[in-house]
A protein has these predicted regions:
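Extended substrate-binding grooves/exosites of carbohydrate-active enzymes
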Residues: 1-224, 232-244
Length: 245
């Protein structure tokens, strides 16, 4: 079940899920049962502990609060229930690749904010081995008739890839940095072309240990790092930026 208590919890609802949980075990005792809980459900509610393992849909850093509240939520749950298997069944932030900003912020639908949000979420997961799984919402932008936001009516834009499957947003590549063994470098913010600042931030994602940045064909700087590499580059006109590893 997904967010089954979104409209409230009743005795019938709980009893029905007890029956379903028992049926699942009867059909295949080797497979654990699980539920995806809406974030409003108290983490100490008995329903949370009905299945063998459980996950929560949390949107701190997008719909509510700040992204570090995800960290605090999991730390508190694990402290109170150290033997309970817990995961993250939904999380995400909307982004329209046409929206660019030098100072991305929550709620601006910018590609840059989505990227830094997912940077945080992946580090949170990597730092907490007790989180059994995270399920990013979503791989692709998808149709949502009731939505009219972020410049694209009828779409949920939480995907790491656009609705037409043609454009990988910057956030796609931070997942590649964590999860892929295929060597790569990716310069973020490439759609942010018209920049007004005299010094601009260039961010590179890579699964390689060292990245070298070239500006107008000349080596600018090299960095050793882990997945995220940041450079400050003076700009005064049109420039060509290249990253190599």
């Amino acid at each position: 079940s997904n967010e089954i208590t979104g409209s409230g919890k009743t005795e019938d609802l709980v009893e029905n899920h007890k029956l379903l949980n028992d049926l699942c075990h009867k059909l295949d005792a080797t497979r654990p049962t699980t539920m995806a809980h809406i974030f409003m459900l108290d983490a100490n509610d008995p329903l949370v502990f009905l299945p063998d393992i459980r996950s929560y849909n949390l949107y701190y850093g997008w719909y509510v609060g700040e992204w570090d509240q995800n960290d605090a939520w999991f730390d508190e749950f694990h402290k109170n229930h150290p033997d309970a298997v817990i995961g993250l069944s939904e999380y995400g932030a909307d982004a329209n690749p046409a929206y660019q900003s030098a100072k991305p912020a929550k709620g601006d639908w910018s590609e840059g904010y989505q990227a830094v949000y997912h940077e945080h979420m992946l580090k949170m997961w990597a730092d907490r081995p007790y989180i059994w799984a995270m399920h990013c919402w979503n791989m692709f932008d998808f149709g949502a008739d009731g939505r009219d936001e972020g410049g694209k009516p009828g779409q949920n834009q939480k995907g790491l890839v656009t609705f037409d499957r043609k454009t990988k947003k910057d956030a796609f590549y931070i997942y590649k940095a964590y999860l892929s063994k295929e060597p790569f470098v990716h310069i973020c913010g490439r759609r942010y072309a018209d920049r007004t600042e005299s010094e601009t931030k260039i961010k590179v994602y890579s699964n390689q240990p060292r990245v070298t940045l070239f500006v107008d064909g000349k080596e600018f700087a090299a960095q050793d790092g882990d997945k995220i590499f940041k450079f400050t580059v003076p700009i005064s006109g049109e420039h060509t930026i290249e990253a190599r590893s």
